[in-house]
Design a protein with these regions (language model features):
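Bacterial N-terminal signal peptides
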Residues: 10-21
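Generic low-polarity alpha-helical segments
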Residues: 1, 8-11
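Compact beta-sheet-dominated domain cores in extracellular/mature segments
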Residues: 2-5, 24-130
Length: 130
């Protein structure tokens, strides 16, 4: 019983030191060289067919254009919002536009999905399409 109590105390100590960093987590993405990227430098895209802060990219579309997922408890701030997808998962949006990756972008900074089928666009620092 004493060993369980010590293990529980250690777990509480780790949790106590972890909470402040979780509460003040950075924005889910950033601007890099004028383009919206995740924190690993992978380019993020918007989809012209999304409207009203709702993602219509599901099924095969979402396999090719994976959403920038939000963790449970993610907090919207400023232009950052969290939308609920049809499957119940949460996705980050910027200025009302759901954000996605492109599966063919393999390295940070690649923008191979930009202007794809004239409906997929890199989000720039002005919020405009590239």
């Amino acid at each position: 019983m004493k060993q369980i109590s010590q293990s529980f105390k250690a777990l509480l100590l780790v949790a106590a030191f972890s909470l402040p960093s979780m509460a003040f987590a950075a924005e889910p993405a950033m601007m890099k060289d004028g383009v919206m990227t995740d924190h690993k430098g992978m380019t993020l895209y918007t989809f012209d067919k999304d409207t009203g802060g709702k993602s219509v990219c599901t099924g095969q579309c979402a396999e090719n254009w994976p959403p920038l997922m939000a963790e449970a408890g993610a907090k919207p701030e400023g232009k950052w919002t969290v939308i609920k997808r049809d499957d119940g998962t949460m996705q980050w949006a910027y200025d009302g536009k759901p954000l996605y990756y492109f599966v063919k972008d393999k390295a940070p900074g690649e923008k191979t999905g930009d202007k794809m089928k004239d409906v997929w666009h890199v989000l720039t620092n002005s919020g405009a399409k590239m």
